[in-house]
Design a protein with these regions (language model features):
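Transmembrane alpha-helices
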Residues: 126, 130, 163-195, 228, ...
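C-terminal transmembrane helix and the adjacent membrane-cytosol boundary/short C-terminal tail
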Residues: 88, 145, 222-252
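Glycine-rich helix-loop "coupling/hinge" segments at transmembrane-helix boundaries
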Residues: 115, 191-228, 247-252
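Transmembrane alpha-helical segments of polytopic membrane transport and secretion proteins
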Residues: 1-18, 237-252
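Generic hydrophobic transmembrane alpha-helix motif, especially the helices
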Residues: 99-135, 142-143
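Transmembrane-helix boundary motif in ABC transporter permease subunits
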Residues: 68-98, 115
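Short cytoplasmic-facing helical segments at TM-TM junctions of multi-pass membrane proteins
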Residues: 143-181, 205, 209
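Periplasmic/extracellular loop-to-transmembrane helix junction in inner-membrane transport proteins
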Residues: 2, 30-74
């Protein structure tokens, strides 16, 4: 009995998830919910199998754009964070504008970027950069602010140059904060890519979702939503794995 309780306690999340899926499937079989509102889990699974080639093709297209935008966003965010930390006037100038941009919904910015930059890959990349830089910049700046003041004084007394203080002290201290922001930005990157694909294009999960909607393939639409969630979760998991290898001292 005790072993059974321990097993249930360890796997309570899995049991709850399976319970929800079971109720969902039963509700669908009893036709309590129309298919266009909520297809059954079995129908969504069948869609994964039936449309696997299309899902793979469009997933790879979305992944390419998301990764490119994320890499550029991370590079820009790191450079901006260092400059804003070093130059107080730059921080006072840029930070309020960044906050204003973050308050504007992504779906509202996307059409403007398409109008300015066309229907190619450029507006998608710009949109991803706009959504992914802010969490990383804020996290890195927060890490810089948590640097020990006594250590900074010690570096100054040792006549260390600014780049030496940055490389040997500030960056190592801010790495955990950087990874916290990176987790958020990874999920933003994939979601933003799909949103940008809604506005037009020839490939990508967002484009495929719109096509499925027009064909009333609601099971495929839900399969795409689940696939985007899985990709985002895998991306966040990769960030966790990377953090464990990069910041080995954090475990101790």
């Amino acid at each position: 009995m005790r072993n059974l309780k321990n097993i249930m306690r360890r796997h309570i999340s899995l049991l709850g998830f399976l319970g929800v899926l079971s109720l969902w499937q039963v509700a669908g079989l009893l036709k309590l919910l129309p298919k266009f509102i909520l297809p059954t889990p079995l129908e969504i699974l069948q869609s994964f199998v039936r449309d696997r080639e299309f899902l793979w093709y469009h997933s790879w297209a979305t992944l390419r754009v998301a990764l490119l935008g994320l890499v550029l966003g991370v590079l820009i965010a790191c450079i901006m964070a260092v400059l804003m930390d070093s130059l107080g006037w730059l921080n006072d100038l840029i930070y309020p504008m960044m906050v204003v941009v973050q308050t504007i919904p992504t779906i509202a910015i996307a059409p403007i970027l398409v109008l300015w930059l066309g229907y190619g890959i450029l507006p998608k990349i710009v949109l991803i950069i706009l959504t992914t830089t802010f969490p990383i910049i804020v996290s890195i700046l927060d890490g810089f602010r948590h640097c020990d003041k006594d250590m900074l004084t010690l570096f100054s007394l040792m006549r260390a140059k600014p780049w030496q203080i940055l490389w040997h002290f500030k960056i190592p201290v801010s790495l955990p904060y950087f990874y916290a922001g990176l987790r958020v930005s990874v999920s933003y990157a994939f979601i933003t890519t799909v949103v940008s694909e809604w506005l037009g294009g020839f490939e990508g999960l967002g484009v495929y979702m719109i096509q499925s909607k027009k064909l009333f393939q609601y099971d495929t639409m839900f399969a795409i939503i689940i696939l985007v969630s899985i990709i985002s979760l895998l991306g966040m998991k990769l960030v966790d794995v990377s953090e464990k290898y990069v910041i080995k001292w954090k475990r101790s």
